[in-house]
Amino acid sequence: MRLEDFNYVLPKELIAQQPAEPRDSCRLLMVDKKTGEWQHRRFGDILDEIRPGDVFVFNNTKVIPARLFGRRKETGGRVEALLLTPKGNDVWEILVNPGRKALPGQEIEFSENFSCTVIDKTEFGGRLVKFHYSGDFDNWLDQLGEMPTPPYIHKKLENKDEYQTVYAKFKGSAAAPTAGLHFTPELLEKMKDKGAELLFVTLHVGIGTFRPVAEENIEDHEMHREWYTIEKETAQKVNEAKEEGRRIIAVGTTSVRTLESAGQTGRVEAGSSWTQLYIYPGYQWQVVDAIVTNFHLPESTLIMMMASFAGREHILAAYEEAVRQKYRFFSFGDAMFLR
């Protein structure tokens, strides 16, 4: 299939610059994956769709304030760094802007007592660096770092928690699993009262999630790697639900990717691993029965995933309807429920 097959026209004013308040007051486009028929609702109305025994799977990764601003020690030139992946012993893979001059041996200072030294280059233009600091690394990030919001969000966050799910637990993401931003503690309790089972997996979202597809033939695209963990009890509960014919509802594309990566045999396997799973039309779904998701960028791997799940024509028609009805798009935007 061609990249242009997943394009749609989006007016810039529909790109949400801040989250809905309260979180579950955003709009919800419910789409039947078999017929393509839709309904316009509010996110809190998802309670009306819950069947007793439904299993909702959330990604409990926590976004770190991974964007740092510093200067090159030798020249004083300004540098922006984005932390991607911890490698152990204070070594991280990062992106550096401007990166051309970030050569091995160069030192970047973010504060008087917090700096890093470039060790090597990595794939996709990254750098391997070792941090030098006194005290606690996380405290330095909290003090100096900014939340790495996507490039299409131009408004500065009023509060770091705006870009964090209410159930975020394990630090490690360079971007939020944004479908989860719509859930409030009160809504989660009401879901349990309706008979839903809430489970959690962890996938640390990498900056590769924003990397555009450059290949015209989508099959030629190389998917980025992300690290996920599924606990033994979670895997058992998902497998039991599948055996009993209960729905597995993934909250967000990262939960989808985790479940499908661990479920390639038809049963979800517990453990931790890297995944490069690339889901596009033609993929054989193994685990997920329904998806709560946001509206994704044109020609992105995420809209391809949705097209694989519900059909390209159904997805593009739903997106066109969302544009007509002036839904809010992308990370802070409104949501879809594909079921």
Stretch-by-stretch model annotation:
Residues M1-R339:
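Surface-exposed, charge/polar-rich loops and edge strands
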